[in-house]
């Protein structure tokens, strides 16, 4: 019975959105928002945060749709809340795509595919923010952005991989 919700979330579509599934997606979004809220401001409108931990956990356990929705909504809402509103539409796309790709490429119980998924999704995030920062702020400002984003990806992966395995075991 506990694995039932995981199956439902992994296979969600607009045709099967129940109140229960919407509630879970809202909790995942809040989880990402709280992770993103735990931040350290950086240079030129950057900030290091733990949002990747939450995005990767949701995507690894519940799949591409949940990872994409939670990543897009939770991260962009925190951009607005923390005073980085200019970044919110870009964050919506970048973090949504990151969560979607991690969930799509990951395979339950396969550590190599999960690491690969995080590397691909994380690099999409790094590239997305580098291009956005170059266009919105300046190209020299991209250098510190890349360092911050790689740190988020690496720390996010190192924390999310063992935690997602443990949570997955509890849900199975």
Which sequence ranges carry the predicted segments?
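Loop-helix junctions at membrane interfaces
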Residues: 1-172
């Amino acid at each position: 019975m506990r694995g039932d919700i995981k199956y439902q979330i992994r296979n969600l579509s607009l045709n099967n959105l129940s109140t229960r599934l919407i509630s879970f997606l809202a909790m995942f979004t809040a989880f990402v928002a709280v992770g993103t809220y735990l931040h350290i401001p950086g240079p030129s409108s950057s900030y290091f945060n733990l949002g990747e931990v939450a995005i990767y956990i949701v995507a690894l356990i519940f799949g591409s749709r949940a990872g994409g929705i939670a990543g897009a909504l939770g991260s962009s809402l925190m951009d607005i809340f923390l005073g980085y509103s200019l970044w919110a539409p870009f964050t919506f796309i970048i973090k949504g795509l990151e969560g979607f790709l991690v969930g799509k490429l990951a395979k339950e119980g396969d550590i190599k595919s999960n690491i690969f998924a995080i590397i691909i999704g994380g690099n999409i995030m790094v590239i997305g923010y580098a291009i956005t920062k170059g266009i919105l702020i300046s190209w020299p400002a991209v250098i510190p952005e890349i360092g911050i984003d790689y740190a988020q990806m690496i720390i996010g992966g190192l924390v999310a991989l063992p935690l997602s395995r443990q949570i997955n075991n509890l849900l199975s």
